[in-house]
Amino acid sequence: MPKQDSLWLKSLRWIQKHLVHTIVVPQDPFADLNLDTSRPLAYVMKTESLSDIAALSEVTEKLGLPSPYEPLVVNGVVAPRVVCLQGRKPLFGERAGNEPFLECFMRLLAVHKERPELDIQLVPVSLYWGRTPGKEDDTMKAAVLERENPTWLRKCFMILFLGRHNFVQFSNAVSLRYMADEHGTDMGIAHKLARVARVHFRRQRKVMTGPLLPNRQALFDSLLKSESLRKAIQEEAVSKKISETQARETAIEYLDEIAANYSDSLVRIAERFLTWLWNKLYSGINIKGAEHIRQLHHDGHEIVYVPCHRSHMDYLLLSYILYYQGMVPPHIAAGINLNFWPAGPLFRRGGAFFIRRSFNGNKLYTAVFREYLDQLFAKGYSVEYFSEGGRSRTGRLLAPKTGMIAMTMNSVLRGIERPVTLVPVYLGYDHVMEVATYHKELSGKKKQKESVWQVFGAIRKLGNFGQGYVNFGEPITLQTFLNEMAPNWRAELADDPEQKPTWLTPAVNVLANRVMTRINDAAAASSVTLTSLALLASEQNALERCLLERQLDLYLTLLKRVPYTSFTSVAEGDGKHLVQQGINLNKFSVSSDPLGEIVSIDANQAISMTYYRNNIIHLFIIPSLIASCLTHNEQSQRQQIVAIVNDFYPLLKAELFMGIKDIPSYVNQVLDLFIEQGLITESDNLSVVTEHSSQLVLLSGSVSETLQRYAIIFNLLAHRPKMERSELESESHLLAQRLGALHGITAPEFYDKKLYGTLSVKLKELGYLSDKDDKSDVKRIRDQANSLLRASVRQTIVASVTAEHIS
C-alpha cells in the first residue's frame, strides 16, 4: 500500500474530497457496536482498493479511530492496519489470491499465542459506491456501475457517477483472542476466518442493496403462470360468464394497479430531497433499536415492518431512516387513495404497492394481491404495512385490521422457508401537520380526498416541527409464534395443505394485538408529549412554570427508574429543558405576573394537544391510577391498590394495548419510587406527604377521564344487569356526551363509539356482560370507580343512570 503522504494518495484524496460524500453506518459505531478504543484494532475488507481505503481514512479521522494507513504494531510485529480478503482486480487478467490475507492472519494469531493478555479487535468494513441492487435482466448500466468486484477503470466510473452515494459500514468486532483460545492458531483457523468473512460480506451486501430487481412485465408473466392465479382466472371466467382471456386481462389490470415499480435512481434522488426536507422540518430524528433489525436482515430473516400510522409523513420517514441505517427501503402497502398523479407514480417507483380499502368479496383481486405478496416474500423484499388501516385521528392506536397480517401468516403456512419476522415500529412527532384536519373530521367534517392540491397546501405549512422519533419494537418471528399457538401446525398442513385450520383466525387476532402492544412498548416520551400530559391534567390547562418543571422531573424519573419496557425511549434533559423545548415549538404559551411565569395551553389548542398526550398515555396510566388511589384515600394499603389496578387492568390493556406482565411487581416498584421521592410515607399504611400532594394530584389527573368512562359503564351494568352489548355501547356513548357537556370534557376519544365497542367486547370476554345473577364483581368495580371520581362527576353519572330516560 502506498504511504499516506505519497503524492499519489494525496492526489486521490483530493479528488475524493470533491467527488465523494460518505455516509457512515451505523452513525455511532462506538455506541452501536461496542468498539473498545483501549484495545488494538484492525480493519477487514473484502477487496483491496485504494479508493475504498481513502474513503475509510476520511471516516476514521472524523470518528477518532486508527487510520487505515497506520501499521498495526503489536509486540514488535508490524502488520497492515487493513487486511483484505482478495487483491485488486487488474484491468486484464486475474486478481491476486488470498495468500497475503492468510499470512497476515497467521502473524496476528501467532502474536496472540505468545501474549495471553493480547486481544486484537477485527472490525469488518464494507464500502458501497451507490446501492444499486442490479436487475434480473442485467443492463449496460449494470455492467458499468453495478458489479460487485470492479476493475480500477470501472471503479473510476463508479466514483464519478455514484461518489455522492458512498456508504461505509462497520460491523461488530471479532475478538482474535476468542478465536485463538477457542479454535487454535494454525492455518486451518485462518482459512476458516476467510470463509466466515466472505459469507459475512456477501450477506452484508444483500442487506445494504437488497435482492435483484425484477423486470415488471416478466414478474407479471411469472405470477400469471402460478397455479393459484390460473385457478382464480378460470373461476372468474366461469362466475362472470366471460372468456379466460378476458379474465386474464382483468388480472393483468389488477396487477398493474397493485404492483410497485421500484427504481433505485428515484430512491437516490428522493434521498437528496428528503435530506433537505428533514433538515428544514426537524431539528433531529431520534432512532432506537435499528442495530437489532439490521442483524435480523443479516441473519436472513424476511422482514415485515408494521408501524403505527400518525401521518402521511410515515411513508417517507421510515423508508428514509432504513436507507440511512444501511437497510433497503421496504415495499410499502399504500391505500389506493394515494394513487393520484403525480404522487402515485412517484410512490410506486419508491416501492409502494397499492391496496384497496376493501376487497368486497372480489376473489380474483384477492388472489392477485395474495400472489403478489407471496412473490415479494419469496424474492426477499422487505415489506411494510400499517395494521391500523388508516391514520389515527386521536393519537391512540386504532384497533388493528387483520387482513394483511392474515395474508402474511398464510404465506408462512404455504411454505416460506426463511424466518418471517414482524417488526413493530413506533413513529412519533413533536408536530403532526394533519392534527387540525383530524379534529375537523372528528367533529363531523367530511374527509377530503387526497389530491395534488393537498400536497401543495401541506408544503405551504412546512415549518419548525421539532423532532421525529423512530423506535423499533420487539420483533415477532411468525414461525416461532405459530409454534407457540399451534405446536403441530406443520404436521397439520402436511396432512391437508388446503385446509383452513380452526386455530388460524384466533391466532391472527392474538398476533395483531401483540403487534399493537409491542408498538406501544416502544413509545417515545418527548418534550411535547410529556408537557401535554402534565398540562392537560391540570384544571385550567395551566401551571406555574416551576411546578410544571418539577412535575416533568418526576415523570422523567418514573420512566427511567421504573421503565415501561426496555424498548421505550425517554427525552434527554430535565424538566426545565423539556418546557423550554415545547415553548420554542410554539406549542405552549407563557405569561408572567409578579409571582412568576405561567405555562399554559391556549383554549383553541387544547383539543389538538390531546393528540400528543394520547401518544404516551399508556406509559403513565397505571402510575396515574395508583396516584388516584393514594389521593382519594387518607390511608391505603399496597394490597388494596394492587387489587384495584388488577380489576381495571384488563380494560386498560384492551383500550391502550398494554403489555405489563407482572402487575403486582410493577405497582410495588412505582410505590417504592413514590416513597423514595418523598411523595408518600409507609408504616402500616401508605399516606400522602402533604407538601408534595399536588404532584400526585396532578399525576392522578391523567387517568380521570378513563375512570369516568369505566364508571359510566359499570354503573349502567350494575343498574341494568341484563343489558345487551349494543344497548351498553349506545347508552354509554349517550351518557358520555352528557357528562362531557356538563363538565367540559373535550378529548375526542371520550366520545369515540368504537372505543365503547372495544370495551364492551372485553367486558363480555371477562364475564361482566352475562346472564349470571351474581353481579358482585360488577358492583365492586363500580364502587371502586365511583370512589376515585370527583364528587360532582360521580353525582352526574349516578343521577343520569338512575334517571327515567336512561333506565
Swiss-Prot record:
Its main location: membrane. One of its GO terms (biological process) is CDP-diacylglycerol biosynthetic process. A motif (HXXXXD motif) lies at residues 308-313. Pathway: Phospholipid metabolism; CDP-diacylglycerol biosynthesis; CDP-diacylglycerol from sn-glycerol 3-phosphate: step 1/3. InterPro entries: GPAT/DHAPAT (IPR022284), GPAT/DHAPAT_C (IPR045520), GPAT/DHAPAT_LPLAT (IPR041728), GPAT_PlsB (IPR028354), Plipid/glycerol_acylTrfase (IPR002123). Its EC number is 2.3.1.15. It is found in: Cell inner membrane. GO terms for cellular component: plasma membrane. GO terms for molecular function: glycerol-3-phosphate O-acyltransferase activity. It is an enzyme of class 2 (transferase). Coiled coil: none annotated. Pfam families: Acyltransferase, GPAT_C. SUPFAM superfamilies: Glycerol-3-phosphate (1)-acyltransferase. It is a peripheral membrane protein. Keywords: Acyltransferase, Cell inner membrane, Cell membrane, Lipid biosynthesis, Lipid metabolism, Membrane, Phospholipid biosynthesis, Phospholipid metabolism, Transferase. It catalyses: sn-glycerol 3-phosphate + an acyl-CoA = a 1-acyl-sn-glycero-3-phosphate + CoA. The HXXXXD motif is essential for acyltransferase activity and may constitute the binding site for the phosphate moiety of the glycerol-3-phosphate. This is Glycerol-3-phosphate acyltransferase. The lineage of its organism: Bacteria, Pseudomonadati, Pseudomonadota, Gammaproteobacteria, Alteromonadales.
